[in-house]
Amino acid sequence: MAVKLLMTWDILPGREQEYFEFVVRDFIPGLQGLGMEPSDAWFTMYGDQPQIMAAAQMSGMSSLQTILDSSDWEGLIQQLLDFVENFDYKVVPARSGFQM
C-alpha cells in the first residue's frame, strides 16, 4: 500500500530567502535521491498551524522506514533545521488531495 510522509515546519524568521534556495537546490533533490516522490507543498497564510506542510509519497511502508532510518535522511533533516523550527512528520496511507 502506498504511503505519504507528511512533514510540517515553520521557517526561521529572517531566513526565508536562504530557506527557499535550500529547498529548491538541496531538499527536494535530496528527497528524490533517497527514493521519495515529492507530491505536495502547502503554505499556511492564516491560523495557528505550521507554516509549511510538505508531502512525499512512497510505494510502501517498509521502503519508507528504511529511508527514515538512514543517515542520509538524518543529514538532510539536519540541513533543513538550519532554516526551520518545529519540524515534525508522520506517515499516513496515501490518497489524492490534501491530507493532514
List each model region and its residues.
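An amphipathic, aromatic/His-enriched active-site/gating alpha helix that lines ligand/cofactor pockets
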Residues: 24-39, 57-92
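Residue-level signal for secondary-structure boundary sites
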Residues: 15, 62-64, 97
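Active-site-flanking beta-strand signature of metal-NTP-handling nucleotidyl enzymes
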Residues: 3-10
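Short, solvent-exposed loop/turn elements at beta->coil junctions and helix N-caps
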Residues: 41-44
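Short acidic/glycine-enriched loop/turn segments that link adjacent beta-strands
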Residues: 46-50
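Short, low-order "capping/linker" segments at domain edges
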Residues: 92-100
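Short, surface-exposed ligand-recognition loops at beta-strand->loop->(often short) alpha-helix junctions
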Residues: 10-22
